[in-house]
Protein backbone atom coordinates (compact mmCIF):
# COMPACT_ATOMS: atom_id res chain seq x y z
CA UNK A 1 0.00 0.00 0.00
CA UNK A 2 1.36 3.41 -0.97
CA UNK A 3 1.22 6.56 1.08
CA UNK A 4 -1.26 9.07 -0.33
CA UNK A 5 0.11 12.48 -1.29
CA UNK A 6 -2.27 15.25 -2.25
CA UNK A 7 -1.86 16.99 -5.61
CA UNK A 8 -2.45 20.76 -5.75
CA UNK A 9 -4.97 20.40 -8.58
CA UNK A 10 -7.10 17.80 -6.76
CA UNK A 11 -7.37 19.54 -3.37
CA UNK A 12 -10.98 20.30 -2.36
CA UNK A 13 -11.13 23.68 -0.58
CA UNK A 14 -14.16 24.80 1.42
CA UNK A 15 -15.10 28.24 2.75
CA UNK A 16 -15.77 28.74 6.46
CA UNK A 17 -16.91 31.79 8.39
CA UNK A 18 -15.72 32.24 11.99
CA UNK A 19 -17.26 34.69 14.46
CA UNK A 20 -14.48 36.18 16.61
CA UNK A 21 -16.88 37.84 19.07
CA UNK A 22 -15.83 36.95 22.63
CA UNK A 23 -13.13 34.50 21.47
CA UNK A 24 -9.65 34.42 23.00
CA UNK A 25 -7.10 35.62 20.43
CA UNK A 26 -4.52 32.82 20.71
CA UNK A 27 -7.01 29.95 20.83
CA UNK A 28 -8.86 31.37 17.84
CA UNK A 29 -5.64 31.95 15.87
CA UNK A 30 -4.31 28.41 16.44
CA UNK A 31 -7.48 26.80 15.09
CA UNK A 32 -7.56 29.18 12.11
CA UNK A 33 -3.88 28.46 11.31
CA UNK A 34 -4.52 24.72 11.60
CA UNK A 35 -7.39 24.92 9.11
CA UNK A 36 -5.47 27.21 6.72
CA UNK A 37 -2.70 24.59 6.61
CA UNK A 38 -5.18 21.74 6.12
CA UNK A 39 -4.01 19.70 9.11
CA UNK A 40 -7.62 18.83 9.97
CA UNK A 41 -7.97 16.83 6.74
CA UNK A 42 -6.93 13.19 6.32
CA UNK A 43 -5.25 14.03 2.99
CA UNK A 44 -2.90 16.60 4.62
CA UNK A 45 0.45 16.75 2.84
CA UNK A 46 3.16 19.05 4.29
CA UNK A 47 4.45 20.36 0.95
CA UNK A 48 1.00 21.00 -0.60
CA UNK A 49 -1.47 23.71 0.38
CA UNK A 50 -4.47 21.58 1.41
CA UNK A 51 -6.15 24.19 3.62
CA UNK A 52 -9.54 25.86 3.44
CA UNK A 53 -10.56 29.50 3.09
CA UNK A 54 -11.40 31.19 6.40
CA UNK A 55 -13.50 34.37 6.73
CA UNK A 56 -13.33 35.98 10.18
CA UNK A 57 -16.03 38.46 11.19
CA UNK A 58 -16.37 40.72 14.26
CA UNK A 59 -12.59 41.10 14.55
CA UNK A 60 -12.98 44.09 16.87
CA UNK A 61 -14.64 41.89 19.53
CA UNK A 62 -11.75 39.45 20.01
CA UNK A 63 -10.47 39.17 23.60
CA UNK A 64 -7.12 38.66 25.30
CA UNK A 65 -6.52 37.44 28.85
CA UNK A 66 -4.73 39.14 31.71
CA UNK A 67 -3.14 42.56 31.26
CA UNK A 68 -2.37 42.01 27.57
CA UNK A 69 -4.75 44.79 26.52
CA UNK A 70 -2.20 47.32 27.74
CA UNK A 71 1.00 45.22 27.85
CA UNK A 72 0.97 43.37 24.50
CA UNK A 73 2.97 45.38 21.98
CA UNK A 74 3.06 45.19 18.18
CA UNK A 75 6.20 46.42 16.41
CA UNK A 76 6.97 47.50 12.86
CA UNK A 77 9.80 49.43 11.23
CA UNK A 78 9.59 52.38 8.85
CA UNK A 79 12.80 51.42 7.07
CA UNK A 80 14.66 54.51 8.24
CA UNK A 81 17.39 54.50 10.93
CA UNK A 82 15.75 54.58 14.35
CA UNK A 83 12.36 54.00 12.75
CA UNK A 84 11.02 51.30 15.07
CA UNK A 85 7.35 51.91 15.84
CA UNK A 86 5.23 50.25 18.50
CA UNK A 87 1.55 50.19 19.40
CA UNK A 88 -0.21 48.27 22.16
CA UNK A 89 -3.16 45.89 21.72
CA UNK A 90 -5.74 48.37 23.01
CA UNK A 91 -4.81 51.06 20.47
CA UNK A 92 -4.38 48.62 17.57
CA UNK A 93 -7.78 46.99 18.14
CA UNK A 94 -9.34 50.46 17.98
CA UNK A 95 -7.33 51.51 14.91
CA UNK A 96 -7.17 48.32 12.80
CA UNK A 97 -8.83 45.29 14.46
CA UNK A 98 -8.18 43.10 11.40
CA UNK A 99 -4.41 43.38 11.90
CA UNK A 100 -4.56 41.82 15.38
CA UNK A 101 -5.96 38.51 14.08
CA UNK A 102 -3.91 38.62 10.87
CA UNK A 103 -0.66 39.08 12.83
CA UNK A 104 -1.47 36.28 15.28
CA UNK A 105 -2.33 33.80 12.51
CA UNK A 106 0.58 34.81 10.26
CA UNK A 107 3.03 34.06 13.08
CA UNK A 108 1.66 30.50 13.29
CA UNK A 109 2.08 29.71 9.58
CA UNK A 110 5.29 28.57 7.85
CA UNK A 111 7.71 31.35 6.91
CA UNK A 112 8.11 30.36 3.24
CA UNK A 113 6.24 30.73 -0.08
CA UNK A 114 3.78 27.98 0.88
CA UNK A 115 2.97 29.79 4.13
CA UNK A 116 2.32 33.00 2.19
CA UNK A 117 -0.13 31.13 -0.05
CA UNK A 118 -1.90 29.82 3.05
CA UNK A 119 -2.06 33.31 4.55
CA UNK A 120 -3.76 34.67 1.41
CA UNK A 121 -6.73 32.39 2.13
CA UNK A 122 -7.47 34.28 5.37
CA UNK A 123 -10.04 37.09 5.11
CA UNK A 124 -10.63 39.21 8.24
CA UNK A 125 -13.38 41.82 8.58
CA UNK A 126 -14.51 44.30 11.20
CA UNK A 127 -18.23 43.95 11.84
CA UNK A 128 -20.66 41.16 11.06
CA UNK A 129 -20.83 41.55 7.26
CA UNK A 130 -18.43 40.23 4.63
CA UNK A 131 -18.35 40.23 0.79
CA UNK A 132 -17.97 36.43 0.43
CA UNK A 133 -21.61 35.34 0.49
CA UNK A 134 -21.31 34.08 -3.11
CA UNK A 135 -18.88 31.39 -1.88
CA UNK A 136 -21.56 30.13 0.56
CA UNK A 137 -19.25 29.78 3.59
CA UNK A 138 -20.25 27.32 6.29
CA UNK A 139 -20.32 28.52 9.89
CA UNK A 140 -17.43 27.14 11.95
CA UNK A 141 -17.77 26.97 15.74
CA UNK A 142 -14.49 27.36 17.59
Swiss-Prot record:
Keyword terms, alphabetized: Ribonucleoprotein, Ribosomal protein
Subunit and partners: Part of the 50S ribosomal subunit.
Keyword field contains Ribonucleoprotein: yes
Record-given protein name: Large ribosomal subunit protein uL13
Job description of the protein: This protein is one of the early assembly proteins of the 50S ribosomal subunit, although it is not seen to bind rRNA by itself. It is important during the early stages of 50S assembly.
A GO-annotated cellular component: cytosolic large ribosomal subunit
PROSITE patterns cross-referenced by the UniProt entry: RIBOSOMAL_L13
Amino acid sequence: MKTYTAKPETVQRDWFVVDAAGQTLGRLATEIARRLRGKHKPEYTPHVDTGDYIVVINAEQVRVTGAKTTDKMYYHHSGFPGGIKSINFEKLIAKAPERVIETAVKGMLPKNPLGRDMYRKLKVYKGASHPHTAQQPQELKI
